[in-house]
């Protein structure tokens, strides 16, 4: 969600792809935001079933295959009228597939990672300055497999910290 507005500002063709989980695309908040921006751009929303799981499992061949399928469903890509020139990565897992996506889409397509907009919004909501005092602390929580998240954190983030399982 936080990357949609910057994507509209960045896009030259005003045709924007959105790769996200099915739950995100179906959420009331996302649908309302999309509706509020409907006149500004055309959005092609693609549910990416299984991509977050493949990233967590570090299954490179599955990541490549899923990214190829999902980008094919969004296209055509390019800088001409009616082509998608910007793709929003609407899940916190998807930046870990950014290199695969960039290779599939080519240099004319901009990938919008939602990490920076999410961090800005979090900082704003918390009311803390960007370089405030105090040490940072990383807490990992998972509703799924704690071991899977621990392995992913070790591989992708190079951090070894305990993972707590939570039930929602």
Region spans (language model):
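Non-catalytic structural scaffold of enzyme domains
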Residues: 1-168
């Amino acid at each position: 969600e936080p990357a949609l507005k910057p994507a509209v500002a960045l896009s030259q063709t005003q045709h924007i792809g959105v790769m996200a989980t099915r739950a995100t695309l179906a959420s009331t908040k996302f649908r309302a935001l999309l509706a509020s921006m409907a006149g500004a751009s055309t959005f092609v929303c693609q549910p990416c079933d299984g991509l977050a799981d493949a990233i967590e499992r570090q299954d490179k061949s599955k990541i490549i295959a899923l990214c190829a399928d999902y980008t094919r469903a969004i296209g055509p890509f390019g800088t001409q009228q009616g082509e998608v020139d910007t793709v929003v990565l609407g899940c916190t897992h998807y930046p870990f597939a950014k290199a695969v996506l960039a290779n599939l889409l080519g240099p004319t397509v901009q990938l919008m990672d939602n990490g920076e907009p999410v961090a800005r919004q979090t900082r704003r909501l918390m009311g803390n300055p960007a370089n405030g005092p105090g040490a940072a602390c990383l807490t990992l929580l998972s509703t799924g497999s704690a071991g899977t998240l621990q392995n992913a954190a070790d591989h992708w983030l190079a951090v070894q910290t305990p993972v707590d399982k939570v039930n929602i």
